[in-house]
């Protein structure tokens, strides 16, 4: 039995590099409409090759902008079937002592790595429930 993903859609955070870029490519190659979210743009050739991908430059720590961007995608696609959170940063040495971490840096890392996932869940889960389908990674 061959799986069909026709008509499915996905949102990928941290989508312009590493794991996020590879996942976006794989999903696009399986006919899934992909909304790529990141602060940096993917290579222009990537978007030309992967016609099922669209990119939006966005700060994942800005709840209102995320909600607006996702709502536009949802209205067009009529569903959000998959959410893949690959956003993550480490802006200090992994071996640094907790007493030496700058509080402002730690707050921003926490917002990006954890708070953004909660924001996305809060925005997307109700849409998945409405459509009685969804998967988050």
Kindly label every feature range from the protein language model:
Residues 57-68, 103:
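The beta1-alpha1 cofactor-binding region of Rossmann-like NAD(H)/NADP(H)-dependent oxidoreductases
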Residues 8, 79-81, 128-137:
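Active-site loop of short-chain dehydrogenase/reductase
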Residues 94-98, 102-107:
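Substrate-binding pocket helix/loop in short-chain dehydrogenase/reductase
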Residues 121-122:
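A short, exposed helix-loop element centered on a Lys and neighboring polar residues
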Residues 16-17:
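Conserved glycine-rich cofactor-binding loop
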Residues 87-94:
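Conserved NAD(P)H cofactor-binding loop of Rossmann-fold oxidoreductase domains
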Residues 30-45:
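Conserved glycine-rich Rossmann-like NAD(P)H-binding loop of the short-chain dehydrogenase/reductase
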């Amino acid at each position: 039995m061959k799986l069909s993903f026709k008509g499915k859609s996905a949102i990928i955070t941290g989508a312009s590099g590493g794991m996020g870029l590879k996942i976006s490519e794989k999903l696009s190659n399986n006919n899934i409409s992909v909304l790529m979210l990141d602060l940096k743009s993917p290579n222009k050739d990537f978007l030309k090759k992967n016609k099922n991908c669209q990119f939006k430059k966005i700060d994942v720590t800005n709840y209102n902008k995320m909600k607006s961007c996702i709502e536009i995608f949802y209205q067009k696609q009529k569903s959000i079937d998959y959410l893949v959170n690959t956003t993550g940063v480490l802006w200090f040495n992994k071996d640094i002592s907790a007493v030496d971490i700058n509080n402002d840096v730690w707050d921003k890392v926490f917002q990006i790595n954890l708070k953004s996932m909660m924001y996305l869940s809060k925005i997307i889960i109700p849409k998945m429930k409405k459509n009685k389908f969804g998967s988050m990674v």
